[in-house]
Amino acid sequence: MTELLPDSVTSSVFLRRDALAAGVSHAAIAAAVRDGDWVRLRHGAYVAGDLFRRASAEERHALLARAVVRQSQTEVVLSHLSAVPEYGGPLWGVPADVVHVTRLDRRAGRKEAGVRQHQGLLQDGDVVLRNGVAVTSPTRTLIDVTTCAQLEAALVIVNDLLHRRLTTLADARQRYETMQHHPYTLKTDLVLRLADPRIESVGETRTFIVCWRQGLPAPVPQWAVNDDLGHEFARLDLAWPEYKVWLEFDGREKYTKFRREGESVIDAVLREKKRESKIAELTGWRCIRITWDDLADPVRLAARIAAVLRLAA
């Protein structure tokens, strides 16, 4: 069905009025949705079914957000959590069905299901064009996220933005100083204190938070290990050098997304085991390996880490 529409329409989100203007009937639209050729993102907004099915959770949110922007009756920019996918960031632990926008006219917006309109004052440099859509800058997005997401979810996003050098802690703190009148910024202080650009992944951030909440010694992210010649051999996800213990987070990406060319999952697992053995040989340290399932029970995970640290002390 999408072949009836121009490429400029079907390449992303299109509205019912776009389809009607292209000569597609109401009945044909209904049939396209029923057959899965189109997916309805929200009332009157669609995307090609194959594009939607290939999309990640973050990409699907970005499609939904574009639908909201296209249907908005006033000028808005994607902001807060809805700005994150435009920078390729993760949306962990947050509602993916709510789109956040900031109005440029600073007026109070009408309540609408699935849309949260913000009235925040946007200063020079706070809005950029990203992927063809107006969105808050990485620095402004970082600050805004801390005001609308829970601590752990916010820190996941903040660390990601910092690690990929889309902004810096210095820039974030400077921008935050100009927003002290902004509501809900008390949590921002804490997030900025906990943030660490060395932390690379969602799993590492969540593990760091477990340690902090359970009163464990703070681990050092990305600890470098050198070989016998003094060359860097590996970087450890999280480490406690004083205890000679390190932690590796075994997320699925380690064995799928980051596989080497021609390497099977089994090959990747074996390579990781050899790497662990070599690190232990070079350092004499003990390794703790955890997975997503471990993070589902933070108290139990903290007890496990604490037990290893006690033995090593």
Regions found by a protein language model. Give the residues of each.
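Surface segments flanking catalytic/ligand-binding clefts of nucleic-acid enzymes
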Residues: D7-T10, S25, L162-A313
